[in-house]
């Protein structure tokens, strides 16, 4: 009998837990377009409370949550300052231009951060030849640097720039719970300077579908209107929101196990192929390895052994740990590494 595959391509491949499936089967539902789904309402209230915001809105995806935030917080014809490799800039099909008529201004993000001084200078330089800056968007954790978390003081520095210029700060917090667990601080502290924040429940938290946008009550009310325009009303979606409630109650603290396993994996990669990865840079659940330091056929060799890994780009191989990868799985991966030689 063949062994089940070990899927390290992304933390989006997780499957609902038995507790989630029971909650989904028993969920009380209503029509959420009318605001009448009690499970969704509880889920939204719980999310807002955990992140210190007034209200929240459940939406089908993180991309939709990001785009709703930009549509409400950024003025048409203005500029949004963001990281050069931010999800909102690189992976959302120019939706900000299409939906919100805003221009994204990317900044270098080699270490996963935005330089507060550079943001401040750009915000000051806006003149009649340049668009006004209406929003700064950050991503915590920063996926392209393999889950590098923003520390509280780093977020605060960017928040101070936003405050000084009277502009909004938005946090794409798809993996904000990974950041909070890695840093040992409440998530609400990490997002306190931000007007609004989004998080996903379908990544490390293991729920099947959706993201939650949290922010001021008036903003969320307007975002609900734009959600409808984008076709994001999901009617009796309490059946999936129920899994999100279970995730918030029981899946956050266990992210520490994912982080520990990612570090173990990084140490093994570094030992097997020196220079491919620096283990001390692995703070959350992702390991990024330099492709040219690895065997050219590594992904194929792993796949032949039932182990799936992915890439961020042509230069970077990524391994993402999650709840469906346990210690025995990691040991199986490490043993497989031992049998693969570097060309």
PLM features per residue range, with description:
Residues 2-305, 309-325, 329-341:
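Conserved PLP-enzyme active-site core in the AAT-like
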């Amino acid at each position: 009998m063949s062994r089940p595959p070990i899927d390290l391509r992304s933390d989006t491949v997780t499957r609902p837990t038995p507790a989630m499936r029971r909650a989904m089967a028993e969920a009380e539902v209503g029509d959420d377009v009318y605001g009448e789904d009690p499970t969704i309402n509880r889920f939204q209230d719980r999310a807002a409370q955990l992140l210190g915001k007034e209200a929240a809105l459940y939406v089908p995806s993180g991309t939709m949550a990001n785009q709703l935030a930009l549509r409400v917080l950024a003025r048409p014809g203005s500029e949004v300052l963001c990281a050069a490799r931010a999800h909102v800039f690189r992976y959302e099909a120019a939706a900000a231009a299409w939906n919100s008529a805003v221009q994204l201004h990317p900044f270098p993000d080699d270490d996963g951060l935005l330089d507060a001084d550079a943001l401040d200078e750009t915000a000051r330089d806006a003149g009649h030849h340049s668009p006004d800056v209406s929003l700064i968007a950050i991503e915590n954790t920063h996926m392209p640097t393999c889950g590098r978390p923003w520390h509280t003081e780093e977020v605060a520095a960017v928040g101070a720039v936003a405050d000084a210029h009277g502009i909004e700060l938005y946090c794409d917090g798809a993996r904000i719970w990974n950041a909070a667990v890695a840093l040992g601080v409440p998530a609400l502290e990490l997002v306190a300077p931000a007007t609004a924040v989004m998080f996903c429940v379908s990544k490390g938290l293991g729920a099947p579908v959706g993201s939650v946008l949290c922010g001021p009550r008036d903003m969320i009310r307007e975002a609900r209107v734009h959600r409808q325009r984008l076709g994001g009303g999901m009617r009796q979606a309490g059946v999936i929101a129920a899994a999100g409630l279970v995730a918030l109650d029981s899946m956050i603290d266990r992210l520490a196990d994912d982080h520990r396993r990612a570090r173990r994996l990084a140490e093994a990669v570094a030992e097997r192929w020196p220079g491919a990865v620096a283990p001390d840079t692995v703070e959350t659940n992702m390991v990024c390895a330099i492709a040219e330091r690895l065997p050219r056929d590594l992904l194929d060799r792993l796949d032949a052994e039932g182990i799936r890994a992915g890439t961020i780009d042509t230069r970077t191989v990524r391994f993402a740990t999650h709840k469906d990868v346990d210690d025995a799985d990691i040991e199986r991966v490490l043993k497989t590494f031992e049998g693969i030689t570097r060309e």
